[in-house]
A protein has these predicted regions:
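Sequence/structural signature of beta-propeller domains
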Residues: 21-449
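Gram-negative bacterial Sec-dependent N-terminal signal peptides
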Residues: 1-20
Length: 449
């Protein structure tokens, strides 16, 4: 019995850091949204093919606009989303990263991802980022500008989908942009197919494409050009599919980019190296990796990250998440066969973590100070918009992919979701998710040390 008690005490002591991480309160201070079906016209010099997007999301080409209803997929209940594709124009959907530095007018630079989720189904999805301005007084979001990525100087080192065109606009068959930073009048984008860092001019022209290096070796994924199929996971490539730079933070003072992979690296045999994510630092001035790398440990139940941004010289915010979607209050009963009105995989882990990047342990792990729970947000003043809140209990943000976070001021942060149009819901069964922007009052989180 004494041995068992001693062993239990030892195990408890070893597990205390994970269990003792402080959970800080969050209060809703503002709520706004961009409607799910928000489209933008391609530039006048874009190929005609790009005026209809989503033609290749099914097994065969489909050129009939709005003819196939979006669906969240069998695992998530098989719910239709009420929005059909192909689209006439390009969907603004998929907010996948905020730049820390805002535009001169105070609007936010926000990135749209590769389009429809994969290299194969997104050759007609244009790549772009925007200036977005949420108005929490009216509950609306204004798209003030869209910048389209293009490669006029042939900087991309492989054949692009629009190789034979004069305008050379980039598409989701070329890159999967997931993180964004603004520095010295240009932009840096972290993407997932390489994974690569893209240096981009203010007008969207590609200036450079830089491969990833960890411990001196180039990292590749299954979608990296040059990786031959069949390829062995952990040997021929180490980065998981959709596991590239979901988060890339710009460090004030040093201007270093801290690039964080979305998912754990693969090892020989196809398994992962652990419940942690790699973080590498890159010097934009030298256009080279510094050689330093760190580890971010995921909490129990988390499978990936959504965004990563500094709030001062050493402290940063990271969104960590599970693969769930929808409020737990609407979860399907265990063993349910009828999932038409419930969520089979409800959201359970949606956190924003505060990191101390100046505190690193002997194994290279960055110190987690604490987090807020996006499934438990107080709303005492009723800021939540009608139809976008639970019937009872606290306000929640129960989306599959929450991919935007940035510091607004000393007490507030801005958070937004990637709505994966037209393939994700989360608020209401059978309805596509909007692009929601929430302003959160989190003074305790932002001041914690």
């Amino acid at each position: 019995m004494t041995f068992k008690i001693a062993l239990l005490a030892a195990c408890t002591a070893l597990s205390t850091p994970a269990l003792a991480e402080e959970v800080f309160p969050a209060t809703l201070a503002g709520h706004a949204f961009l409607p799910a079906l928000s489209l933008v016209a391609p530039p006048a010099d874009a190929p005609r093919d790009l005026w209809i997007s989503g033609k290749f999301t099914g097994p065969t080409r489909n050129e009939a606009p709005m003819s196939v209803m979006g669906n969240v997929g069998k695992s998530y209940g098989g719910h239709e989303t009420g929005i059909a594709l192909p689209f006439i124009g390009q969907p603004v959907q998929g907010m996948s990263g905020f730049a820390m530095n805002r535009a001169e007018d105070g609007s936010w630079f926000a990135l749209t991802d590769n389009g429809f989720g994969s290299k194969a189904n997104s050759p007609d999805a244009m790549l772009f980022f925007h200036r977005m301005a949420p108005d929490f007084a009216t509950g609306t979001v204004t798209r003030k500008e869209t910048i389209f990525l293009h490669d006029p100087d042939h900087k991309v080192p492989f054949r692009i989908a629009n190789e034979g065109t004069d305008s050379r606009y980039l598409t989701g068959a070329d890159f999967d942009p997931e993180s964004l930073q603004s520095l010295d009048g240009t932009f840096w984008i972290g993407e997932e197919f390489g994974p690569y860092l893209l240096h981009v001019a203010r007008d969207g022209a590609i200036l450079d494409v830089i491969p990833t290096r960890l411990d001196g070796a180039v990292l590749a994924g299954p979608d990296t050009p040059g990786v031959k199929v069949p390829a062995e996971a952990g040997k021929d490539y180490q980065v998981q599919r959709s596991g590239g730079y979901e988060g890339m933070a710009l460090q004030p003072g040093t201007n270093l980019l801290w690039a964080m992979l979305e998912k754990p690296l693969l090892v020989a045999g196809g398994g992962t190296e652990g419940d942690f994510l790699r973080v590498m630092t890159f010097d934009p001035a030298k256009k080279d990796w510094t050689g330093e790398s760190f580890k971010f440990r995921l909490s129990e139940g988390a499978t990936a990250i959504g965004d990563f941004n500094f709030i001062d010289a050493t402290h940063a915010l990271v969104i960590e998440r599970d693969n769930g979607e929808g409020d737990a209050a609407k979860a399907c009963a265990a063993g349910a066969t009828d999932t038409s009105a419930c969520y089979p995989i409800p959201a359970k882990v949606k956190n924003i973590v505060l990191l101390d990047t100046a505190s690193v342990d002997a194994e290279g792990y960055l110190r987690r100070i604490g987090h807020i729970d996006l499934l438990n947000i107080a709303d005492p003043e009723g800021k939540a918009l009608a139809g976008m809140k639970p019937a009872a209990g606290p306000f929640t943000f129960p989306f599959f992919t929450i991919e935007d976070v940035a510091r607004v001021d000393d007490t507030h942060i801005l958070v937004a979701n990637d709505n994966n149009l037209p393939f994700s819901g989360g608020r209401e069964v059978g309805k596509a998710a909007n692009n929601e922007f929430i302003l959160l009052s989190v003074p305790e989180l932002l001041s914690a040390k």
